[in-house]
Design a protein with these regions (language model features):
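Actinobacteria-biased recognition of intrinsically disordered, low-complexity terminal regions
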Residues: 1-9
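Short, solvent-exposed loop/turn elements at beta->coil junctions and helix N-caps
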Residues: 6, 84-90
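N-terminal strand-loop-strand
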Residues: 8-50, 100
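Short, charged/polar surface micro-motifs in flexible loops or helix N-caps
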Residues: 24-27, 37-40, 56-57, 93-94, ...
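The catalytic Nudix box helix
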Residues: 50-85, 140
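Active-site-adjacent beta-strand/loop module that shapes the phosphate/pyrophosphate-binding cleft
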Residues: 88-125, 137, 159
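Non-DNA-binding regulatory cores of transcription-related proteins
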Residues: 128-134
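Charged phosphate-binding loop/patch that engages nucleotide di/tri-phosphates or the phosphate backbone
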Residues: 137, 141-164
């Protein structure tokens, strides 16, 4: 990576993701993931995210979104759900994120994320393994808007507008 949010070729990094939603008696709820690892362990508000991952080259964006949902929840996305295109946002570091909403249900207690390794503690020479997503939860839109990363809030607004 040559600069934050760009690839070695200078092109912006792009991630693709899925925002799972359900409609309950209490209204619209969305499923968000809390990033794993030591940097996020004490953070909550403005930290949760849609389930997403970076594209590798010219991969199909929607296919990447579906794959990343499975990797980060341990579950296949709902196969018969009609995707709602939530468009694209740019996060603070310059990374572009595209997302689709799918209607479905998932028990957060049954979610299991893939893992990553990093040196921890810093400069210790030791490697530790962490889940990419350490918590998963359903939130009503008001709560979700405080939990989700600020740059991703438009996804919530676009979903609400699409379902109105």
């Amino acid at each position: 990576m040559s600069a934050r949010g760009t690839s070695l070729t200078g092109m912006p990094l792009v991630s693709a993701g899925i925002l799972l939603y359900r409609v309950t008696d209490d209204g619209l709820e969305v499923l968000l993931g809390h990033p794993g690892g030591p940097f996020y362990s004490r953070k909550d508000d403005d930290t949760w995210t849609v389930f997403k991952g970076e594209l590798d080259g010219n991969e199909d964006r929607y296919a990447v979104a579906l794959r990343e949902f499975e990797e980060e929840t341990g579950h296949l996305p709902p196969p018969d759900a009609d995707p709602i295109d939530l468009g694209e946002i740019v996060q603070r570091g310059g990374k572009h994120v595209v997302a689709w909403a799918l209607e479905g249900d998932l028990d957060p207690d049954e979610a299991a994320s893939n893992t990553f390794e990093m040196e921890w503690p810093p400069r210790s020479g030791r490697t530790a393994e962490f889940p990419e997503i350490d918590r998963v939860g359903w939130f009503d839109l008001a709560t979700a808007s405080t939990k989700i990363r600020a740059a991703q809030r438009p996804f919530l607004e676009r979903l609400e507008a699409a379902l109105a």
